[in-house]
Design a protein with these regions (language model features):
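Short "domain-exit" segments at the C-terminal end of structured domains
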Residues: 358-362
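RNA/tRNA-interacting regions in translation and RNA-turnover enzymes
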Residues: 1, 5-357
Length: 362
């Protein structure tokens, strides 16, 4: 049926499609009931909705007006569920993961666990080789002075950066995870963190003095300004990321104001590292700053994930046209962590369980 609905804000509609709610309905954002009323002396049987009233973040819809009615795509069919048309009809599962199961702090980890639980085949994501014919070693040098606190440090580089909003599908998945979309580069690092459970950080290459990265502890009494503009007092137990002249980040916690990504950035260094969990937990407490990254690091991450995660980020950068990936990777990994294997006697287990299901191939 047809209903008259008057907008509060000025809006030009020439056969356009809008999200509307009619008398007796409710807004998906806060459940407010929609009632028939009069606006400027004219009866209105409903309302036209903004993206916020539909329960969406306006950052996900850069074409939406600052305030006012959101115009739906022209191919939208009148009468369709607007929430579904905008891709907001989704199911989100929340898991309460105990601290000893850091392997499940990611989508891949949950998928692997579900495959084992329900006896399904787990297929890991396919990460393709990325990068041009250049060599990252011609651009950047990395040195780790404390391999106990940083057992692995991977770095890759991207030039000709093209900052833009990330695609809607990525924004929706991040929003469902409670992460606000920012731009394609930031969103990719957050997306990979949710996917692999591996935190990443991006540095502005042109702001790295000497075009080098040095991982070492701070000096007692050092003061460092983090990305949030706050000054943090350091001591010699706190691991820092440095360039050739200065500190540019608190390892595993937050980067510095002096190397942040700005809109005019052209070249970036992507860090994917493994830091000592206990040290990160104590450092976060000392500087009074706990982040999503530090929360993951302090549980104790698998260093073998670092390389695959940064390669996955570079793959997404190429697929989304966000920049040109420079060939090669810098991987400082002096003592490789081997898989732990537990020997067992399959015949004895079968005998004790009165079963023949296990064999030595397991």
């Amino acid at each position: 049926s047809l209903h008259d609905a008057l907008p509060i804000f000025p809006v030009v509609l020439d056969g356009g499609r809008v999200a509307g709610g009619h008398d007796g309905g409710a807004l998906p954002e806060d459940g407010i009931k929609i009632k028939k009323g009069k606006l400027r002396g004219v009866e209105s049987c409903g309302m036209m909705c903004s993206v916020e009233e539909l329960g969406a973040d306006r950052d996900m819809y850069p074409d939406a007006p600052e305030s006012g009615i959101y115009i739906l795509p022209k191919d939208s069919v009148p009468g369709e569920d607007a929430v579904a048309v905008m891709g907001l009809r989704d199911v989100v599962f929340e898991y309460e993961i105990t601290s000893n199961r850091v392997d499940c702090y990611s989508v891949i980890g949950i998928a692997r666990e579900a495959a084992a639980t329900f006896k399904k085949t787990f297929t890991a994501p396919s990460v393709t080789k990325t990068g041009n014919d250049e060599d990252i070693n011609d651009y950047l040098k990395v040195r780790v002075e404390n391999s106990r606190l940083c057992p692995r440090y991977c770095a890759r580089m991207v030039k000709n950066i093209r900052l833009a909003p990330s695609p809607r599908w990525m924004q929706r998945r991040l929003a469902a995870s409670g992460i606000r979309p920012i731009n394609n580069i930031v969103d990719i690092t957050n997306y990979v963190m949710e996917e692999y459970g591996q935190p990443m950080h991006a540095f502005n290459y042109d702001q790295l003095a000497g075009h080098e990265i040095i991982v070492k502890c701070a000096k007692d009494g050092d003061v460092f300004q983090t990305l949030d503009g706050q000054e943090r007092k350091l001591d010699s137990t706190i691991l820092m990321i440095n360039d050739g002249e200065k500190e540019v980040g608190i390892a595993g916690i937050m980067g510095g104001e002096n190397s942040k990504i700005t809109d005019d950035v052209t070249t970036m260094v992507f860090e994917s590292a493994c830091f000592d969990g206990t040290n990160i937990r104590l450092s976060a407490k000392k500087v009074g700053l706990r982040t999503d990254a530090s929360g993951k690091y302090e549980k104790g991450l698998d260093p073998n994930t670092a390389e695959e995660a940064v390669n996955r980020a570079c793959q997404l950068i190429e697929e989304l046209g966000a920049g040109e990936v420079i060939g090669g990777i810098i991987d400082i990994y002096p003592v490789k962590k081997e898989d732990k294997r537990i020997p067992f006697d399959a015949a004895r287990i079968n005998r004790d369980r009165k079963s023949t299901r296990l064999n030595s191939s397991h």
